[in-house]
């Protein structure tokens, strides 16, 4: 088990940082939307864009992953997520924010798929459950830390 963790520690560290950023983004966007005067329905639509992106990303990203590989998909999805966060600062509009939340959800779906498939490749039948439980602890712990 220790060997499997040592070969994937960078993946876990990256996941921890990404999850913390995601948790922070949820809190800050909701607060900033209220401060900007978005009504509750607009704020709800903005925040639900993330889950629409997760849904579409979970369907589309595996096809992209099969054609270009783990590293390229992870890099592209990280870049999309980073750009989406920055666009929130530039535009103070619910429709633009909804599109960026969709992009964030899409890219996070991609990063989660890459992480999970990488872990499944590295795991043996004996270590798979332990690695995936560490993955979930890291993911949810990072989100909690970000909030």
Please annotate each region the language model reported.
Residues 6-51:
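Helix-loop boundary and gating motifs at the non-cytosolic
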Residues 29, 110-123:
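Intracellular juxtamembrane helix-capping segments at the cytosolic ends
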Residues 57-69:
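Helix-to-loop junctions at the C-terminal end of transmembrane segments
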Residues 69, 90-93:
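Helix-breaking motifs and short loop linkers at transmembrane-helix boundaries and internal kinks
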Residues 72-86:
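Structural signature of the two symmetry-related core transmembrane helices
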Residues 95-103:
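Paired small-residue
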């Amino acid at each position: 088990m220790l060997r499997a963790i040592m070969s994937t520690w960078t993946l876990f560290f990256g996941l921890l940082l990404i999850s913390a950023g995601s948790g922070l983004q949820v809190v800050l966007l909701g607060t900033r939307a209220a401060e900007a005067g978005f009504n509750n329905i607009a704020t709800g639509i903005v925040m639900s864009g993330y889950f629409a992106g997760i849904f579409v990303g979970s369907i589309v990203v595996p096809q992209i992953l099969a054609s270009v590989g783990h590293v390229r998909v992870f890099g592209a999805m990280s870049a999309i997520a980073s750009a989406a966060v920055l666009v929130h600062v530039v535009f103070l509009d619910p429709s633009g924010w909804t599109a960026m939340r969709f992009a964030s959800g899409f890219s996070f779906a991609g990063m989660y798929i890459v992480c999970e498939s990488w872990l499944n490749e590295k795991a043996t039948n004996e270590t798979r459950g332990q690695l995936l439980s560490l993955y979930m602890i890291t993911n949810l712990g990072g989100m909690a830390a970000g909030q």
